[in-house]
């Protein structure tokens, strides 16, 4: 299974957490910079060719007007996960632009700067029918649980005069 990750600007910084997760899960992926406004022909070529190239999920990060995610979704049947980027208006403009798509053009949307959750959601989509990937994802989520258990164990050792636990 292949996954594409697209966005403008410092793509690596914006998508680093998703990229690290995909790498950990041994899922081949690519990272590119595209703009719905500055490189519309390239966006169209990518979106219209994604399915034929074997792309199963697209992660698109965008800020401000955040049209990239919706433009890609309008040109493909491949699921698109939108990552709103905090650039102006604390990222609320991007969040609303991505989440408020017209009927028939869905974009799965994660939180502002939520590249890690976009990666996890993409892995969950790719894991449908793939037991090996499901097992990797289950182990990843179990590790998340262990981190919380460990944090609680460490907090139990912290002492304050009025702390009750």
Where are the regions a protein language model picked out?
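Single conserved hydrophobic/aromatic residue that forms the stacking wall/gate
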Residues: 1-12
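C-terminal binding/interaction regions
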Residues: 10-13, 17, 92-165
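Active-site-proximal loop->helix
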Residues: 19, 24, 43-47, 74, ...
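Acidic, glycine/proline-rich low-complexity segments that act as flexible tails and inter-domain linkers
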Residues: 29-31, 41, 64, 76, ...
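N-terminal beta-loop-helix "entrance" segment that forms/cooperates
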Residues: 31-52
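Short, ordered loop/turn segments at secondary-structure junctions
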Residues: 34-36, 63-64, 85-88, 112-113
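Glycine-rich phosphate-binding loop
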Residues: 46-84
């Amino acid at each position: 299974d292949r996954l594409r990750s697209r966005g403008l600007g410092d793509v690596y910084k914006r998508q680093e957490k998703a990229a690290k997760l995909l790498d950990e899960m041994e899922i081949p992926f690519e990272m590119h910079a595209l703009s719905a406004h500055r490189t519309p022909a390239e966006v169209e070529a990518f979106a219209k060719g994604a399915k034929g190239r074997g792309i199963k999920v697209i992660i698109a990060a965008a800020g401000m007007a955040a049209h990239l995610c919706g433009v890609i979704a309008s040109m493909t049947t491949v699921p698109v996960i939108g990552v709103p980027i905090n650039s102006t208006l604390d990222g609320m403009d991007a969040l609303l632009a991505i989440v408020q798509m017209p009927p028939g053009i869905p974009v799965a949307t994660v939180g502002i700067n939520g590249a890690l959750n976009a990666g996890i959601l993409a892995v969950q989509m790719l894991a449908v029918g793939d037991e090996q990937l499901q097992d990797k994802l289950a182990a990843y989520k179990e590790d998340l649980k262990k981190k919380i258990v460990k944090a609680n164990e460490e907090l139990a050792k912290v002492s304050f005069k009025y702390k009750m636990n």
